[in-house]
Amino acid sequence: MATPLIDDDELDDLEREFVARVRGRVLEIGAGDGENFGAFDPDVEWQGLEPDATRRAELATRAKEWRHAAVPLDAKAESIPLPDHSVDAVVGTYVLCSVTDQAAALAEVRRVLVPGGRVVFVDHVQAPPRTLKRFVQAVATPIAKRVCHGCHWDRDTEQALVEAGFTGVDVRRLRVRSMPFGPVPMLLFDGRAPGA
């Protein structure tokens, strides 16, 4: 079966749908400047993690506007300053592409999640082998890492999630229309940590 091809608006709707699923104590890693606040259920107890000082300042302002009590944490996903089993869910949109070490970040996510906790990740991912898009990703990634907050356009994020022990409940592989080098492969992953 062919991977569905969608446009940016359809992707935005799916992102909001996936983020809206989380409940309870929620950690958002790489929370940026708060783009996901409108998608969260109003009853979540939100905590954000953002290593970039400029984004974190904007995030703090927006968190107050959305009535979230927590102050965003200055930390990277590879070293989350929270106790073991302290959150019910972890959300990351366009963040696993830019962490320094995916395996270390996902190990930290597992550590802070309660057993059976939920993970929701949305990210662009590695294109299929022997495609123009895969070639473009290989050429562009060294540049993107320097100018796009460490972004790797060529990561196999789904495999990293599986290797970290997460089980997909709703996993969608999509392609988003893009020019000039063709559609961007995307992954939407709603899953669980071990121990449910």
Question: What are the functions of these language-model segments?
Answer:
Residues 2-9, 122-183:
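C-terminal alpha-helical "lid/dimerization" subdomain adjacent to the S-adenosyl-L-methionine
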Residues 5-25, 35-39:
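Conserved alpha-helix/loop element of class I SAM-dependent methyltransferases that forms part
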Residues 25-28, 32-79:
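Class I SAM-dependent methyltransferase SAM/SAH-binding core
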Residues 45, 116-118:
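Short glycine-centered segments of the SAM/dcSAM-binding site in methyltransferase folds
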Residues 78-90:
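A short acidic, Gly/Pro-enriched loop at the edge of an enzyme's catalytic core
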Residues 88-101:
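A short SAM/SAH-binding and catalytic strip from SAM-dependent methyltransferases
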Residues 103-115:
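A short glycine-rich, Lys/Arg-flanked "PGG" loop and its adjoining helix->strand segment in the class I
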Residues 186-196:
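C-terminal lobe and adjacent flexible extensions of AdoMet/dcAdoMet transferase-like proteins
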